[in-house]
Amino acid sequence: MAQKAPMTVTFVTGNQNKLKEVRAILGEEHADKFTLEARKVDLPELQGEPEDIAKEKVMLAARQIDGPTLVEDTSLCYNALQGLPGPYVKWFLDKLGHEGLNKMLAGYDDKSAYAQCVFAYVDGPNGEPKVFVGTTDGKIVPARGPTDFGWDPVFQPDGFEETYAEMDKAVKNGISHRYRALDKFREFILAEAAGR
């Protein structure tokens, strides 16, 4: 009996750093079961709760891809600001920079925050989206480390003395909000691939 070709999942991103990190977290050991290919798809910027945004984004993308589709929505949530900037952190970072993200908490004693990653997957344009959420608690600190990957320099996860940006990639990829969400996705997609 011939072995089935691996299931191909299209990850919607134009961010090469994110793609590299997602591939590193998912690993190559399951390449015979599923493969991840990246595709940049223009999607509208949606507003709402992170899980709702991810579900809507994956359905919009699946209509263009017409096959198994994966999207990600990441949030950085300040507890003192009741979760802001949340899913809008990209826009806050673009306008304020790392220093501005830090200064948002200048008037607050509470510097605690959490990083949240929401992946949404659907098997095609008529499917029902599935959501996988990962969260890492930490705090907002003055920017430290390389500044080439989003807000990583200002987020220091609980239990560590380094920001995400300062961490060895293997350490970050084993504790991050993205890892926690992808770990759930990996378990799901392996079961899906086995059932084909």
UniProtKB/Swiss-Prot annotation:
Cross-referenced Pfam families:
Ham1p_like
Record's keyword annotation contains Transmembrane: no
Keywords per UniProt: Cytoplasm, Hydrolase, Magnesium, Manganese, Metal-binding, Nucleotide metabolism, Nucleotide-binding
Name the catalysed reactions.
ITP + H2O = IMP + diphosphate + H(+); dITP + H2O = dIMP + diphosphate + H(+); XTP + H2O = XMP + diphosphate + H(+)
The UniProt entry's GO CC annotations, sorted and at most eight, read: cytoplasm
Q: Where in the cell is it found?
A: Cytoplasm
For this UniProt entry, the molecular function terms from Gene Ontology, in alphabetical order, are: dITP diphosphatase activity; ITP diphosphatase activity; metal ion binding; nucleotide binding; XTP diphosphatase activity
Cofactor(s) the record lists:
Mg(2+); Mn(2+)
Annotated ITP binding lies at 13-18, 57, 73-74, 90, 149-152, 172, 177-178
Under the heading InterPro entries, the entry gives:
ITPase, ITPase-like_fam, RdgB/HAM1
Return the EC number.
3.6.1.66
Positions binding Mg(2+) in this chain are: E45
**What enzyme class is recorded for this protein?**
hydrolase
Question: A single GO BP annotation from the record?
Answer: nucleotide metabolic process
Question: Coiled-coil segments, which residues?
Answer: none
What does the record give as the function of this protein?
A: Pyrophosphatase that hydrolyzes non-canonical purine nucleotides such as inosine triphosphate (ITP), deoxyinosine triphosphate (dITP) or xanthosine 5'-triphosphate (XTP) to their respective monophosphate derivatives. The enzyme does not distinguish between the deoxy- and ribose forms. Probably excludes non-canonical purines from RNA and DNA precursor pools, thus preventing their incorporation into RNA and DNA and avoiding chromosomal lesions.
Q: How does it assemble?
A: Homodimer.
Family as reported in the entry's similarity comment: Belongs to the HAM1 NTPase family.
The identity of this protein, by name, is Inosine triphosphate pyrophosphatase
- What is the organism of origin for this protein? Micromonas commoda (strain RCC299 / NOUM17 / CCMP2709) (Picoplanktonic green alga)
Its taxonomic placement starts with: Eukaryota, Viridiplantae, Chlorophyta, Mamiellophyceae, Mamiellales
